[in-house]
């Protein structure tokens, strides 16, 4: 496990952060998230990672091993345990979690993102070709869109929430996920989404 944050609170009982970038290593693969609430309880050796409701914190956990975007409310892992539990928040009325393959295509999302000036996913893909990479400063993308960073920030949060990009607001960097390119190019692929309920 790797965790990174601008601010960790460390005391005798726990290690915590309101916003941490995390990476679970699974052999050559990983489960990652750009900005979860991080809490490690020392007494029970248990780590709880909680997604937020909006912006970067609402982004899915990306599972490169199973090639899934995962949308549980929280992930709970006891050190040394081979199992990671997905659980709802205490008192949560919604006990559903969603897992979507990287090739899953939702026409409603695509249409929702499409505006008078076209679809931002297509624009970002074209920008990566021109830029020569899939990670870049947010200022470069804003210039390509002919807007200010502030003008496109809401869009970046929204695309992060959908799992198309990771926007690191602290470092002002954008990295495109495989899902962005799949969404544009693989509409004819087999699409799979797995809604589930916590037990």
Task: Set out the residue ranges of the language-model regions.
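Short amphipathic alpha-helical interface segments
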Residues: 111-145
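Accessory beta->alpha helical hairpin/"wing" motif in late/C-terminal subdomains of nucleic-acid enzymes
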Residues: 169-188
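Secondary-structure transition motifs
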Residues: 91-120
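Basic amphipathic alpha-helical segments that dock to polyanions
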Residues: 141, 155-162
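Single conserved hydrophobic/aromatic residue that forms the stacking wall/gate
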Residues: 191-198
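Beta-strand-dominated lipid-handling architectures at cellular/organellar boundaries
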Residues: 1-62, 67-69, 74-88, 92-94, ...
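A short, conserved structural fragment
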Residues: 160-170
């Amino acid at each position: 496990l790797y965790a990174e944050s601008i601010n960790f609170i460390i005391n005798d009982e726990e290690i915590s952060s309101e916003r941490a970038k995390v990476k679970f290593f699974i052999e050559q693969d990983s489960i990652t998230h750009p900005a979860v609430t991080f809490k490690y309880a020392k007494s029970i050796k248990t780590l709880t990672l909680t997604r937020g409701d909006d912006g970067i914190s609402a982004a899915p956990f990306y599972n490169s091993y199973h090639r899934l975007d995962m949308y549980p409310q929280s992930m709970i892992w006891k050190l040394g345990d081979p199992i990671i539990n997905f659980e709802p928040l205490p008192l949560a009325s919604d006990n559903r979690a969603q897992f979507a393959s990287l090739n899953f295509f939702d026409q409603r999302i695509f249409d929702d993102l499409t505006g008078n000036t076209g679809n931002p996913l297509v624009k970002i893909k074209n920008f990566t070709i021109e830029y020569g990479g899939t990670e870049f400063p947010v200022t470069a993308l804003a210039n390509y869109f002919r807007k200010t960073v502030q003008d496109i920030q809401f869009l970046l949060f929204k695309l992060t929430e959908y799992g198309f990009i990771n926007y690191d607001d602290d470092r002002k960097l954008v990295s495109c996920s495989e899902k962005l390119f799949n969404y544009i190019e693989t509409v004819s692929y087999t699409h799979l989404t797995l809604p589930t309920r916590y037990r």
